[in-house]
Amino acid sequence: MMIKNKKKLLFLCLLVILIATAYISFVTGTIKLSFNDLFTKFTTGSNEAVDSIIDLRLPRILIALMVGAMLAVSGALLQAALQNPLAEANIIGVSSGALIMRALCMLFIPQLYFYLPLLSFIGGLIPFLIIILLHSKFRFNAVSMILVGVALFVLLNGVLEILTQNPLMKIPQGLTMKIWSDVYILAVSALLGLILTLLLSPKLNLLNLDDIQARSIGFNIDRYRWLTGLLAVFLASATVAIVGQLAFLGIIVHVVRKLVGGNYRVLIPFSTVIGAWLLLVADLLGRVIQPPLEIPANAILMIVGGPMLIYLICQSQRNRI
């Protein structure tokens, strides 16, 4: 009971930190906002300067929150489905496949913009299915699976590089220049994906069982591995449709697991909040380090995530010895 109360208190503290960070991000920028500016806006409803800043910053903040949460949860689901603590949508090529499909859809069927998350999901499925098929045949260990994923990532990014030589082929570049329609599109995918994840979370702990143990209790482990993997790909692909590729947010789950343990009923909510906070901080730092220039949030995530991935690979190899 005491441990549960501590986790609840920690979760509330993280929520407060997330809200505080969102407020700081909202009032910070080339044009700063004061509390009085916001108070005047919400009491009188008339402040054109604040209105313009709201339309610039608030969609960006909301998208950062949703994308961070979705990618962190996607990482947790992928790791559960593949039984690999190194799995992450960007590393295994899922994001690259989704981005290629997104680019092709915008070139040939731009009128389906609202359906981009679903269409990108189809592209993200291809590298995921390749990983699954190869793993079923060769039984990769954790590091070998990631190496195959990196090879797919490089291959698909090469294809993407060729496609983007076409001046009409536009791909999203991070969190900049986001508008309210992007928020609405992503919100639908976020609500659907995260609600399904919460419904699925009681079964995720059972994915750690081997096939014999699962069958002995009547648990269809193959079905739930597929459902979990598909949901992970959907969450990651939906974010790619709006912001493009963001690296390493999925492996933050390893840190969350150290904090709260491996119970997915607890791990998923904590990953949601910490993932949202991490991307929001990365975006905020990118805006304030060298104004008026902006450092992409993805660059900051790569600087932090690269050493973390090296550490996880070394730890995985040490555990095999």
From Swiss-Prot:
GO terms for biological process: siderophore-dependent iron import into cell. Induction: Repressed by fur in the presence of iron. GO terms for molecular function: transmembrane transporter activity. Keywords: Cell membrane, Iron, Membrane, Transmembrane, Transmembrane helix, Transport. It is a multi-pass membrane protein. The keyword Cell cycle does not apply. It is found in: Cell membrane. The chain crosses the membrane at residues 9-29, 61-81, 89-109, 114-134, 143-163, 179-199, 233-253, 267-287, 294-314. GO terms for cellular component: plasma membrane. The keyword Membrane applies. Belongs to the binding-protein-dependent transport system permease family. FecCD subfamily. Part of the binding-protein-dependent transport system for heme-iron. Responsible for the translocation of the substrate across the membrane. This is Probable heme-iron transport system permease protein IsdF. The lineage of its organism: Bacteria, Bacillati, Bacillota, Bacilli, Bacillales. The gene is isdF.
